[in-house]
Amino acid sequence: MAQKKTNSKKPLIILCVVVIVAVLAFLIYDEVQSSNYLNQLNEAISNTAALESGSAVGHSYLYAEGADRESGSSETRHAIYLRGDDGITFQESAGNEDGSELTSNFYIRPGEYFYLDTENDQWVRTDLQEGLNVRPYSLSAATSSVSSSQIRRIHKTTVDGKDAFEVIYNRQWLMSSYQGQSTDEPLTGSVIYILATDGDTTYVEETRQTLNVRVTDSDGNTSTQISEDINQLINGTTEDGGDVQQALDDFFAQNIEGNYIESTDLETETDTATKSGEETTIGSSGEETTVGSSDENSAE
C-alpha cells in the first residue's frame, strides 16, 4: 500500500518540477527580452538627442479621473532647435492653443538665455552656465535615457502602424522623482515612445506620458487627477516645413534684438522698486527648471 502511495505521488512531483522550470524559464526569457527592449529604446533616445535640428509641438492636459480631457486645464508648446559644435540653440513658447496668451517664452543659445517677462512684454538676458545641457521641455522625454531602476515593465507595441515601446514606471521611482505638492501621491505613470526612421537611424518621433496622482485639498478631501503630456517631433524642419536656422534668426531679430535688458539691470530695478514701496511683478525666470531638462535637472 505504501509503495502504491509513493508511486501515485511521483507524477505530481514531476508536474510540480516541470511547472517550476517553466516559470523560471519564462522569467529568465522575460528579463532578457526586457533588457533587449530597453537597449533598443535607449539607442533610439540617443539618436533623438543627436538630431541636428527640428521642431516640436507639445500638449499638456490636467483633468479629474473619469472626466473628459477638455474639462480640465491645458497648455500648448512650440519649439524649434538647432545643434552646433558649441551647443544647442532653441526657442520654445508655452500658452494657449492659438498662442495669443503665453505663459512662458524662451530663447536659449550657448552661453546665454533670454526669457520674456510676460507682464511687461520685456525680454531679459542672463548668462548660461557653460556646458549645461539645456533642452526644450518638449524634447525632454524623447531625449532622456531610461534606467532599469525606473521601470516596472517595458514592452514593444505598435501605434498607428508604427513601432513603439511602452514603459511603465515603478512606484518607488515615481514617488522619489515627483515634483508636485508634498501632499500629492503619484499612483501610476507610463510613457509610450513612438518610433520613426531616417535611413538606418531609428529615433523617437512622439512621446505620450500619463501620470495618475492622488491629490488632497485644503479640507482633506482626496481625488485622482490625470496628467497627460504629448509631444510630437519634426526632424530637420520647422512645423510648417521651413528652415530651422532661418526661423531662429528671424525670431531673434523680430522679438529680442533691441528689446531686452540684462538680468542684473532687472534686479537693480526690482531692488529700487522694493525700497520705494512699489509692487513689482516679474515673469517666469529662465533659471527655473521648467526651461527644459538637463542631465543634472529633469523637468519632469
Show the residue positions of the predicted features.
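Flexible, processing/modification-adjacent segments and terminal tails
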Residues: 34-37, 111-183
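Short, exposed beta-strand/loop patches in secreted or surface proteins that constitute
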Residues: 47, 78-83, 105-107, 149-158, ...
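Short, hydrophobic/aromatic-rich segments at coil-to-beta transitions
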Residues: 51-57, 85-91, 160-168, 203-206
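Short consensus segments that form the blades of beta-propeller domains
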Residues: 69-71, 104, 180-185
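An acidic-aromatic
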Residues: 75-139, 212-214
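Gly/Pro-enriched, hydrophobic low-complexity segments
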Residues: 96-98, 160-270
